[in-house]
Amino acid sequence: MSRKQLALFEPVLLVQALTDAVKKLSPRAQWRNPVMFVVWAGSVLTTLLTLAMVTGQIAGSALFTGVISLWLWFTVLFANFAEALAEGRSKAQANSLKGVKKTAFARRLRAPRHDAQADNVPAAELRKGDIVLVKAGDIIPCDGEVIEGGASVDESAITGESAPVIRESGGDFASVTGGTRILSDWLVIACSVNPGETFLDRMIAMVEGAQRRKTPNEIALTILLIALTIVFLLATATLWPFSAWGGNAVSVTVLVALLVCLIPTTIGGLLSAIGVAGMSRMLGANVIATSGRAVEAAGDVDVLLLDKTGTITLGNRQASDFIPARGVDERALADAAQLASLADETPEGRSIVILAKQRFNLRERDMQSLHATFVPFTAQSRMSGINIDNRMIRKGSVDAIRRHVESNGGHFPADVEQNVENVARLGATPLVVVEGARVLGVIALKDIVKGGIKERFAQLRKMGIKTVMITGDNRLTAAAIAAEAGVDDFLAEATPEAKLALIRQYQAEGRLVAMTGDGTNDAPALAQADVAVAMNSGTQAAKEAGNMVDLDSNPTKLIEVVHIGKQMLMTRGSLTTFSIANDVAKYFAIIPAAFAATYPQLNALNVMGLHSPNSAILSAVIFNALIIIFLIPLALKGVSYKPLSASAMLRRNLWIYGLGGLVVPFIGIKVIDVLLTLLGLA
């Protein structure tokens, strides 16, 4: 992925964020955040009190009240700035996507074939179901499926990846995205969406959406923060009659300052920024999440369903050997295997053709001159092949070929069963070749497990995440590769129905499941999974079923998605712990300052030795505002994440953010008090 990453504090974004922070001072904007709305209300109240004192309408220190009011406004502005900066980063990413959208004309065909008559129409007039022809140099005008042709496509505007990709009709690489460019050849595309509903439009709307829906965890945390705010509001309100009864009523300004310092303003001011930044980090990883809910679910995932090919193994299985059945010549097996693979454009199919050529000098033959019919592979049949003259040649998985042989009145030889088992035990994939009802032998396909993948799975296991390998291989091959890779479990001979059933089984146990997919046959399982990452190179059905799209089309990205989700949850939890813990230091600063005149015994709580009641209150309010600014980088970047168990992460966060939340305010408030005293402002 080569898309330029935004600096944490881009100057242009800072200026825009400052402007937006001021705009967010309106009551309507503040009402969306109940904790900060209380601070906003306190700011308005103390501002009115300051004006009343300046004009002589009420008695009191206009300077002290004015300074308190100023720092309360700063508290609100800093919280607004954090949210605006996070949103600004997302909007900047959205603007880069908007640059991809270009006004273009399209060749709308009157019939679904490339030589049909075409009309030039604006791309905005295209509707779902329209057929368009795009040629080399053209911008693809709409999202759709290739129904004819094949071409090299530059998708760098969407994915950031400069290497072109092949898009062709049939299979799982027929999906194209509007805004990408054709580099060579031509494609006939059936538009799959209406204007304004394209993948690019949805990406932009998701990234820059101002009305971001809160996630379930955010809602739960907001309810907790509101409850704490109400408790502290009631507690603060009851302190005035207590102090008045003692003969020295506390001023409204001090009570407002006390309330603002007691309520969890730190997490209240940063909560929205954390959520927006989480989605922004996901986009930085070239993954588009349809909502914050999907990012949050990624952090709670405890089961990963991982495709073997491309995720656990390198994905370029190569034919390594022909093992004939008893009584069959190896050359005859190689010839039949090559014929069955002539129209098979998969890496495995091409490698079979090449191996037969290398071993026996068998040259490729033209399908048309042979008057042959190719039988493509399907997830249901799990075999492919060719019909030529009176010959019916198939290659496929052991079970699929066994069913095929038995349905044609044949018998599956015991020696072939043994050869299949031997190949599988070595971790290779056996493909069986059959002609009619006669089994000819086995092709061995070697697969290589990715380096370092076993260690990554060990880290996931420490975090309490179960890894399950999904493969179409037989159980012996799957077991050998699973053991080598270090996964916890595997699903062999997987069909779409089996994947769906496995996901439902785990969900019935109360677990959250994540998976990747790219084909139409993956759509049901993607729709069922809690976190479903569809490949951008996959079909439209897969992308619509998933709640995330990986622009790099890298199945391994699922592990990174889980890491980002967990980092967002950890950031939220860590800053909540810090916010609640640092209230303790504020108690020791404000309560003695506010009530020592009425109850002298409270002077014992002034453990920081603050200079005066006014400096103590002002120091606490200033610290309360500044800590939001200091924590903005942490909220946007996320806390340092290490793959640990839940209990180990809890202990680590309590030590760092719990203890830190207790210690930092004591130091910060004391330093501010000393500075105020030195400057003569105490």
UniProtKB/Swiss-Prot annotation:
Keywords: ATP-binding, Cell inner membrane, Cell membrane, Ion transport, Magnesium, Membrane, Metal-binding, Nucleotide-binding, Phosphoprotein, Potassium, Potassium transport, Translocase, Transmembrane, Transmembrane helix, Transport. ATP binds at D344, E348, F377, T378, A379, Q380, S381, R382, M383, S384, K395. One of its GO terms (cellular component) is plasma membrane. Mg(2+) binds at D518, D522. The active site is at D307. It catalyses: K(+)(out) + ATP + H2O = K(+)(in) + ADP + phosphate + H(+). One of its GO terms (molecular function) is ATP binding. CDD domains: P-type_ATPase_K (cd02078). Its EC number is 7.2.2.6. The keyword Glycoprotein does not apply. It is a multi-pass membrane protein. The chain crosses the membrane at residues 34-54, 58-78, 219-239, 254-274, 588-608, 616-636, 662-682. It is an enzyme of class 7 (translocase). NCBIfam families: ATPase_P-type, kdpB. The system is composed of three essential subunits: KdpA, KdpB and KdpC. Part of the high-affinity ATP-driven potassium transport (or Kdp) system, which catalyzes the hydrolysis of ATP coupled with the electrogenic transport of potassium into the cytoplasm. This subunit is responsible for energy coupling to the transport system and for the release of the potassium ions to the cytoplasm. Belongs to the cation transport ATPase (P-type) (TC 3.A.3) family. Type IA subfamily. PANTHER family: POTASSIUM-TRANSPORTING ATPASE ATP-BINDING SUBUNIT (PTHR43743:SF1). This is Potassium-transporting ATPase ATP-binding subunit. It comes from Salmonella paratyphi A (strain AKU_12601). The lineage of its organism: Bacteria, Pseudomonadati, Pseudomonadota, Gammaproteobacteria, Enterobacterales.
